[in-house]
Amino acid sequence: SGVYIYSYAFDNQQAADEASMVINCLSGHNPRLPVYYDLEDNSIIANGRQTGIASRAQVFCNRISAAGYEPGIYANLNWFNNILTDSVFKSSSWDHWIAQYNSQCDYTGNYSFWQYKSNGKIPGINGNVDMNYAYVDVSLYHWQLIDSTWYYAASNGKAYTGWLFQSGTWYWLEP
């Protein structure tokens, strides 16, 4: 499981408040997938606010990471190519989930998930559902016991190293 939040933050304080709300909701839970922050609302970039979008994303994602969860950014292809252009969106360790309703994803950066349609059908669910491809093994987002040693896999499938905060406990994971 993972988390998705649609942001309405106009400033850094509101981004921090959104992060706190997510962290409070996650208390006692350990999602395997990242906490995806959707910054696509036009109101948050209106009236010159676009210049602060990278700062708001950093505030949110840093708080999510400090609480022991993996942050990610969700947006459609147009936003990644034309709005989320600050280097923090390209060079950060934040996971990317791209929405592009097409037969292929044309995003040239790294991404783990591609939302390819919004009108999918699932038996037992009334109405349309979003359909996604995962380019990572989602089963890797958890603790693994390998040869009597515990590892925690990050979104890229590699063993996490350094300090990790999970379910209210800090762990030191050797490199």
Describe each PLM feature range:
Residues 1-70:
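Substrate-binding cleft of extracellular glycoside hydrolase catalytic domains
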Residues 13, 47, 83, 108, ...:
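Short acidic, gly/pro-rich beta-turn/loop elements at beta-sheet edges
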Residues 14-23, 80-90:
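Distinct, well-ordered alpha-helical segments
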Residues 64-82:
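Aromatic-lined carbohydrate-recognition surfaces of secreted/lumenal glycan-active proteins
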Residues 87-139:
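Functionally critical loop-and-helix segments that line ligand-binding/catalytic clefts
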Residues 139-175:
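Extracellular adhesion/carbohydrate-binding repeat motifs centered on closely spaced tryptophans
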